[in-house]
Amino acid sequence: MAEEHRCQTPESNRLCVNNCGFLGSSATMNLCSNCYGDLCLKQQQQSSSIKSTVESSLSVSPPSSSSSEISSPIIPPLLKNPSVKLEVPEKKAVISLPTTEQNQQQRPNRCTTCRKRVGLTGFKCRCGTMFCGVHRYPEIHGCSYDFKSAGREEIAKANPLVKAAKLQKI
């Protein structure tokens, strides 16, 4: 009877393998998004710890019993002059960017022709000015933008002229 009515549970709705109560996905190894994120973080931490142990093992030089002449480290220090100081750039908060965005949002957009407030429903023409729904057409507001030459340039860029080499007659 279950075959007739197809009352089987779909394979995509499986519970998480960790039994956390959420649904898992086959794309995330039958884990829910929370458990999968935790798994990814653990893998990244393990890989970073492996890298640090490899780097530390490479930086330690093997002890040499017969050669007492080598007293300097294998890798010379990058900075031998102590009077030169390294400048570490500090994180500075960029305040000018949000203020310009706020100024643009606070400034009311008005139609250039009738000075009607348009807000978000305004239309910006290719000539660079803002218009309302009535004056948005180039014929109505006397647009100075040359649509024909712009169209020709776009077509020329999209379809470059392909010139084949001439065939020589035998």
From Swiss-Prot:
Zn(2+) 3 binds at residues 125, 127, 141, 143. Signal peptide: none annotated. One of its GO terms (biological process) is cellular response to hypoxia. A zinc finger (AN1-type) spans 105-151. InterPro entries: AN1-like_Znf, AN1_A20_ZnFinger, Znf_A20, Znf_AN1. SMART domains: ZnF_A20, ZnF_AN1. A zinc finger (A20-type) spans 10-44. Zn(2+) 1 binds at residues 16, 20, 32, 35. One of its GO terms (molecular function) is DNA binding. Transmembrane segments: none annotated. Keywords: Metal-binding, Zinc, Zinc-finger. Zn(2+) 2 binds at residues 111, 114, 132, 135. Residues 53-76 are annotated as: Disordered. May be involved in environmental stress response. This is Zinc finger A20 and AN1 domain-containing stress-associated protein 6. It comes from Arabidopsis thaliana (Mouse-ear cress). The lineage of its organism: Eukaryota, Viridiplantae, Streptophyta, Embryophyta, Tracheophyta. The gene is SAP6.
